[in-house]
């Protein structure tokens, strides 16, 4: 009987700490003072870890220094992806901000460095060097 990767990993109990970019890639967009960041799993077996750990609260804490007023997460399970809409994070938006990155395009990179705990059994599905 085949055990799904997440169930096998949970049974082993071992975890490794890795940044989010080892599990997923991301893309940022903007509209006014709102940023949206898409997070897409590199492999379907990593989806459950993303749903469990890349939450609205985790994202809000990650962007705490930018003082977002609201973070919403939208799950796209058939695509093994999620989209975050983060309000009031661009210092007024493109026309009002003095930031070098007024579109917030680098925000995905900030999120992709989020540390996660991944079951060791899922290590073969992680991107990049160990």
Segments from the language model and where they lie:
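Long, contiguous binding/interaction regions
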Residues: 2-130
């Amino acid at each position: 009987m085949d055990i799904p990767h997440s169930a096998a990993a949970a049974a082993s109990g071992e975890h490794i700490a890795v940044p989010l970019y080892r599990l997923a890639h991301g893309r940022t967009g903007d509209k006014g003072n709102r940023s949206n960041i898409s997070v897409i799993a590199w492999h379907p077996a990593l989806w459950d870890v993303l749903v469990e750990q890349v939450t609205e609260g985790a994202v809000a804490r990650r962007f705490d220094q930018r003082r977002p007023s609201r973070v919403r997460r939208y799950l796209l399970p058939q695509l093994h992806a999620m989209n975050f809409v983060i309000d009031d994070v661009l210092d007024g938006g493109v026309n009002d901000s003095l930031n070098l990155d007024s579109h917030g395009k680098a925000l995905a990179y900030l999120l992709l460095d989020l540390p996660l705990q991944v079951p060791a059994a899922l290590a073969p599905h992680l991107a990049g060097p160990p």
